[in-house]
């Protein structure tokens, strides 16, 4: 085992919600109105061994925000995966902030039984509000450690 922490890379790009008519933008300091955050679940590295002695991991990610779930495709038999799948998260008025956390859960797909939870991490509502309020067109990426039962998930990789 390599014993490195299992980590997920997320990318975010701030944008406007497409509309039939262009909106009149207020002054730069007054951020309000609807916004879209394009959240990309980029990749995961250092997954743990999940499927018995010989099996690796069949990971997929579920991103949950304001009651809506977004799911990546399942990657088979691996200790790392690249998804680069983008989901559009919308908010009606950024001036009010965001009250919901964003939860990302990693799962191990199983053909014959219930899928197993690998672990998860949360992006706090306050941080989501900051992201939604960032300048339109701005983007960045962040790496998150996957947590299970209060501890960092450690990868197998070999």
Where are these regions (language model features)?
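Short glycine/proline/serine/threonine-rich loop/turn segments at secondary-structure transition edges
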Residues: 95-100
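Short structural boundary motif marking the start of a folded domain
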Residues: 33-38, 59
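C2 and C2-like phospholipid-binding beta-sandwich domains
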Residues: 1-18, 45, 51, 58-60, ...
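Short amphipathic beta-strand segments in non-cytosolic proteins
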Residues: 62-69
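A structural motif detector for short, solvent-exposed N-terminal "entry" segments of globular domains
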Residues: 36-53
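Intrinsically disordered, low-complexity terminal tails and linkers
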Residues: 11-28, 38
């Amino acid at each position: 085992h390599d014993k490195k922490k299992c980590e997920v890379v997320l990318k975010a790009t701030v944008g406007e919600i497409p509309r039939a008519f262009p909106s009149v933008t207020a002054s730069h300091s007054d951020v309000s109105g609807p916004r879209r955050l394009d959240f990309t679940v980029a990749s995961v590295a250092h997954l743990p061994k999940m499927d018995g002695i010989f099996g690796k991991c069949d990971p997929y990610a579920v991103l949950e925000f304001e009651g809506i779930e977004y799911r990546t495709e399942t990657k088979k038999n691996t200790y790392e995966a690249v998804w680069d799948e983008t989901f559009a998260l919308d908010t009606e008025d950024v001036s009010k902030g965001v009250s919901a956390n964003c939860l990302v859960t990693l799962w191990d797909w199983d053909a014959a039984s219930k899928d197993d939870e690998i672990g998860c991490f949360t992006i706090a509502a306050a941080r989501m509000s900051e992201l939604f309020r960032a300048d339109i067109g701005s983007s960045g990426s962040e790496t998150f450690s996957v947590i299970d039962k209060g501890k960092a998930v450690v990868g197998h990789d070999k």
